[in-house]
Amino acid sequence: MPVVDISAAEIGIYSLSGDTKNPTPNIEFNLNSFRDPLGNLHLRRTCVDGKDPAVQEWIKVDPRFEPILNQCIILAKDATQGGTKWFSIGFRDHHGTWISRAVATLISNELATLGFKVGVLHAKGQD
């Protein structure tokens, strides 16, 4: 199933910056400990934000990514099998432009591949 418009989703995925107040997700992951793509000169020069596939591939190597993905799959299954009509997961990092957008995009694509009706909202980053 492809990622859908956020208004048609049963699971909302949000990328958030340090100062984003809304939306407020049901569950939020703090990604500040992830390695920062801005530290990679090639990515910084060739990519615009975390929605770029090169940034996403770089983020997937971080040892924190796979456990978060697995936890999100469990949360999505629990929410939808429990009859919840709406459930949201947020990913926050300082800038909200690189790490959180990459993780939100990767997680939403994986959940959609598993058949969940997922929508993504990328909040305005600080960059």
Annotate each PLM feature:
Residues 3-5, 86, 114:
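Catalytic phosphate/metal-binding cores of nucleic-acid and nucleotide-processing enzymes, i.e., regions
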Residues 26, 83-87, 116:
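Short coil/turn segments at beta-strand junctions that form active-site/ligand-binding loops
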